[in-house]
Amino acid sequence: MAAGSTGERPFFEIITSIRYWIIHAVTLPAIFIAGFLFVYTGLAYDAFGTPRPDSYFQASESKAPVVTQRYDAKSQLDLRTK
C-alpha cells in the first residue's frame, strides 16, 4: 500500500471490472425507468402536491389571473377563485 493511501481500490480499477458493469447494467436503466414512470403516471404530482398541467386554471378562464394592486393581491385572487 502506498504512503497516503486510504486503502480503497483505485477508481480506474473499479470501472474496468466486470463485476461493476454487471451490477450497473441493471441498476442504471432501472433507476431511469423508475423515474420515467414516476413522472409519466402522475405520481410525482401527487407526491409533491403540485397541480397537474390541466388544472392550473378554471375551464372558463382564458388566461392567467393578473394582480393589479400589490398590497391587495390576496383578496383579488380570492375573488377570482370564488
From Swiss-Prot:
It is a single-pass membrane protein. One of its GO terms (cellular component) is plasma membrane-derived thylakoid membrane. Keywords: Electron transport, Heme, Iron, Membrane, Metal-binding, Photosynthesis, Photosystem II, Thylakoid, Transmembrane, Transmembrane helix, Transport. With its partner (PsbF) binds heme. PSII binds additional chlorophylls, carotenoids and specific lipids. Its main location: membrane. Its cofactor is heme b. It is found in: Cellular thylakoid membrane. One of its GO terms (molecular function) is iron ion binding. Signal peptide: none annotated. The chain crosses the membrane at residues 22-36. InterPro entries: PSII_cyt_b559_asu (IPR006217), PSII_cyt_b559_asu_sf (IPR037025), PSII_cyt_b559_N (IPR013081), PSII_cytb559_asu_lum (IPR013082). HAMAP family: PSII_PsbE. This b-type cytochrome is tightly associated with the reaction center of photosystem II (PSII). PSII is a light-driven water:plastoquinone oxidoreductase that uses light energy to abstract electrons from H(2)O, generating O(2) and a proton gradient subsequently used for ATP formation. It consists of a core antenna complex that captures photons, and an electron transfer chain that converts photonic excitation into a charge separation. This is Cytochrome b559 subunit alpha. The gene is psbE.
